[in-house]
Design a protein with these regions (language model features):
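Short beta-strand/loop motif that positions the catalytic acidic residue
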Residues: 371, 377-379, 383
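Acidic, glycine-anchored loop motifs typical of Ca2+
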Residues: 82-89
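Glycine/threonine-rich phosphate-binding loop and adjacent beta-strand/alpha-helix elements that clamp
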Residues: 451-744
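C-terminal membrane-anchoring or membrane-association module
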Residues: 825-838
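Short beta-strand element of the alpha/beta-hydrolase
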Residues: 107-117, 658
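Accessory cap/linker subdomain of secreted extracellular hydrolases
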Residues: 1-51, 60-63, 117, 121-192, ...
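Intrinsically disordered, low-complexity repeat and linker tracts
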Residues: 698-700, 705-818, 836-838
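Conserved alpha/beta-hydrolase "acid-adjacent" motif
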Residues: 384-391
């Protein structure tokens, strides 16, 4: 709320002027709760939870507009295209949620949109193929028909927001999903935090899903365009209807026109995809574990992740095509849809695993000049589903576009930092993620000047101590650790036959990090100082096919942190069982979340980064489109390769070792029918590792297997230092200057800055509190990094204070400033308790 600083001594006595200003702030909150005509309240640079909440998780007979403080209703937005060939532009269903004050016209609300194809339901993931669904497997389709544009509908009448909300049924958004065993829309309550702070929330599953028309096309321009159309409706530039048949128009007369998109995974993907269209009104995006280019979700440098059907675009389309659950609806489209899926499969595999036009229309990085939004990009550094390359591709594109972009990199896996469905969230230096997101959206959607754009470019959680977060002024690093492979043999050959090499698939990473074998090459280098890796790692080598047939000969490279003794490190991104109850404040009459911490494990190895390339794609670079061309590998014919390992931000401790490992295929993702062998020129192998510390070069010595008794007796081979190849090097964009870390304020801010309130329009003429005033990125455990990391001394001395915002429950403190605050807020707390029964 901004009553005091987080670092305040709660035992000191309060002065009369301080008390008066605290009372003034408390009264603003008190009055906002009771105002007959409500509008968002902004204190301390954040929207405050002054709107009451009621759930939408009810049966039709129990849900009534009159009893609802959050009103809900469906709309059906008309798109541009007729993908299902029924002669009409497709309609996409969207569920709108608003504070009742917004529906009644008290103020115009900013909108959060989650475009998530899973949200209307899914099919059984174990039976998602044409065969298992009883659909034909031999059809074809004219893909140009997907872009047909018949004439638009003509409205016959219109309905107001309140009229639509009064007619709405809970079953429009709360119904049982027979294959998921949950109720959809499952994100119904994921954004309650923002609803009680005066935002509107819209959820849509898009084309081809239950309640909508059209075909799901797995990330294509058609899918993205349909979600873009929802934003255009919010901006008054497109029509929507109250249902699919009556042609009764409904306008977003409640909307300010300012929209943010956020969501995890596919919903994180659509945020970036829609932003790449340049649609007007989309002010900011917060993609979490989103896909930047679908080619790099299913493939890497000419080789695939996984086997069919899970490596097929069509699998995801079938999985979310819940129009099948409505038999009458499905009866009219199944033939065309199955033909479309057959054609999609043919088109995807017509170019093997190379980049093609199928992937081009699902690559959102191609035109960065269209990006006109700010972005807070969120990604788990242990995410093996949507790999970390995607956040870097997004970051690069947004930087090239000159947009304000920040990275929030946590140690989790494929998870949103506020995991509503799991009942917990994470904090960074004491600030929960929703508090950060509140600050971000308050600035970009309501125009409050809270200096959020001055946040550090990168905030990253430490890999060995998750309580620590480091801040960096940019993502790119100009320093490199060069590892030059050193071996007594100029050539080494490995096989795809892991079994013969004595490698168990379950323990492969641990085994190959220790020594070479018939199935892997391992080179090890000592770490002589703490070294922080920041970015993607390039590994150059020269290799040739030694044995095999076909065109898919995957090479999997690993960089591994290895030590003789166990060390602490975050494992696979799972959280501890013990969580801090109620530590993640929600506000209003919402239940708080628990605060979770990522679990560390004791281990002797941790894979830092992985990369995959096909021997058939020597010209493949980092960007997806560079993987268009391939060759027919010939036995004994050498080519130069550069494999790009996934980006990471990872600190390796002094005394550890870095193991650079080469395998054939990655058995965690793929199986191969025919064995193959690959020969490497060992003196060609070099890794260029981006680091925070100064550039240095080291040798990485070949580690023979225990059975390779001849190796010790071989003479040493002197190899020259390898010059990094220029074939794939691309000029980096120039970072804007300056990018700097915001240091914490040592003094209390002026209260007339700290306690700005009222509407966004009123706020804009004042300077409200800076980022460093409230819960902030810097504490006694954080690091601010420019080139070399350095510990930042916080203004907070001794034990860290509680969160700035009110918490559920209380702690005993000496009567003083904290006691005065409690007294001034007691009437507000009592009133909020009374409203919990609403």
């Amino acid at each position: 709320l901004g009553l005091i600083e987080k670092s305040e001594d709660l035992t000191r006595k309060v002065s009369q002027p301080e008390l008066a200003k605290m009372y003034e702030t408390a009264k603003k909150l008190y009055d906002a709760y009771r105002a007959e005509k409500k509008s968002p309240l902004f204190l301390n640079g954040r929207a405050q939870p002054i709107f009451p909440y009621t759930t939408g998780e009810k049966s039709d007979q129990d849900y009534k507009y009159e009893d609802s403080q959050i009103v809900r209703f469906p709309v059906y937005v008309e798109t541009d295209y007729d993908t299902d060939a029924d002669g009409k532009p497709d309609l996409v269903k969207a569920i709108v949620q608003l504070p009742k004050a917004v529906a009644q016209g008290d103020f115009k609300a900013a909108t959060i949109l989650e475009a998530r194809p899973y949200v209307a339901g899914t099919l059984d993931e174990n039976y998602v193929t044409l065969e298992s669904l009883g659909l034909p497997t031999d059809g074809s389709y004219d893909m140009k028909k997907l872009h047909s544009q018949p004439g638009k509908r003509q409205p016959v009448s219109s309905a107001t927001t309140v009229e639509a909300a009064k007619k709405a049924k809970a079953s429009d958004w709360y119904y049982y999903s027979p294959y998921e065993y949950i109720y959809d829309y499952e994100d119904l309550n994921w954004y309650d935090y923002f609803l009680v702070r005066g935002y509107a929330f819209i959820s849509s599953a898009g084309l081809g899903t239950k309640g909508s028309e059209g075909f799901n096309t797995t990330g294509s321009d058609l899918e993205i365009n349909a979600f873009k159309n929802i934003i255009e409706w919010v901006n008054g530039k497109r029509k929507a209807y109250t249902d699919k048949t009556s042609n009764v128009e409904i306008k977003a007369d409640w909307a300010s026109g300012n929209v943010a998109m956020t969501g995890l995974s596919w919903a994180g993907t659509t945020t970036f995809g829609v932003a790449a269209t340049g649609v007007e009104g989309l002010k900011t995006i917060v993609p979490a574990a989103g896909i930047a280019s679908w080619y790099d979700y299913f493939n890497s440098q000419g080789t695939q992740f996984g086997n069919a059907p899970y490596s097929d675009l069509s699998w995801l389309s079938l999985y979310v095509s819940t129009r099948m659950l409505d038999q009458d609806d499905w009866a009219g489209i199944w033939q065309n849809y199955s033909n479309y899926i057959n054609q999609l499969n043919k088109d995807q595999y017509a170019h093997d695993r190379n980049y093609s036009d199928v992937w081009k229309e699902r690559d959102y990085t191609l035109h960065p000049e269209n990006l006109k939004t700010s972005a807070l990009i969120v990604h788990g550094l242990n995410d093996d589903n949507v790999k970390t390359k995607h956040f870097e591709l997004m970051y690069d594109a947004l930087k090239k576009a000159g947009q304000d972009v920040k990275l929030y990199l946590h140690q989790g896996d494929h998870v949103y930092p506020a995991a509503m469905s799991r009942g917990y969230g994470i904090t960074a230096n004491g600030q929960d993620f929703y508090d950060l997101l509140n600050t971000w959206l308050t600035h970009y959607l309501y125009g409050v000047d809270n200096h959020v754009e001055s946040l550090p470019a990168v905030l990253a959680q430490n890999n060995y101590d998750p309580s620590k977060w480091a801040s960096y002024d940019n993502w790119k690093s100009n320093q490199r650790l060069f590892l030059n492979a050193s071996s007594k043999r100029l050539e080494e050959t490995i096989s795809s036959d892991y079994a013969t090499a004595g490698i168990e698939i379950a323990n492969r990473n641990e085994t190959v990090s220790k020594a070479s074998s018939k199935a892997n090459l391992t080179f090890v280098s000592d770490v002589t100082e703490d070294t922080t890796i920041k970015g993607h790692i390039t590994v150059h080598f020269k290799a040739a096919l030694a044995k095999g047939q076909g065109k898919n000969f995957q090479i999997n490279a690993l960089l591994v942190d290895v030590a003789d003794e166990d060390f602490d490190v975050v494992g696979n991104g799972s959280v501890k069982q013990d969580k801090t109850a109620d530590g993640f404040w929600m506000g209003s009459n919402l239940s708080n979340l628990s605060v979770a911490e990522y679990e560390t494990i004791k281990t002797k190895y941790k894979v830092i980064a992985k990369g995959w390339i096909n021997l058939a794609n020597p010209e493949s670079g980092y960007d997806s489109a560079s993987s268009r061309a391939s060759i027919e590998p010939k036995v004994g014919e050498y080519h130069d390769y550069t494999v790009y390992l996934q980006p990471n931000l990872y600190t390796v401790k002094k005394g550890h070792k870095l193991a650079l490992v080469f395998n054939t295929y990655d058995p965690s993702d793929l199986t191969v029918e025919h064995p193959y062998e690959v020969t490497f020129k060992t003196d060609s192998i070099q890794a260029a590792i981006p680091i925070v510390e100064k550039t240095r070069a080291q040798k990485a010595a070949y580690v023979p297997s225990a059975t390779d008794t001849d190796y010790a007796n071989l003479p040493e081979v002197e190899g020259g230092a390898l010059v990094a190849p220029e074939v794939h090097y691309k000029q980096e964009y120039t970072l804007p200057s300056p990018e700097y870390f915001v240091q914490p304020s040592q003094t209390l801010p002026e209260k007339d800055e700290q306690m700005q309130t009222g509407s966004a329009r009123q706020e804009q003429s004042h300077l409200t509190l800076a980022v460093s005033y409230g819960p902030r990125f810097v504490t006694t455990t954080s690091e601010s990094v420019t080139e070399d990391p350095q510990e930042v001394t916080s203004a907070v001395g001794g034990e860290q204070a509680d969160h700035m915002l009110p918490q559920t429950g209380s702690k005993d403190h000496a009567l003083g400033l904290f006691g005065v605050i409690s007294l001034t807020a007691s009437s507000l707390i009592f009133w909020r308790k009374k409203r919990e029964d609403a």
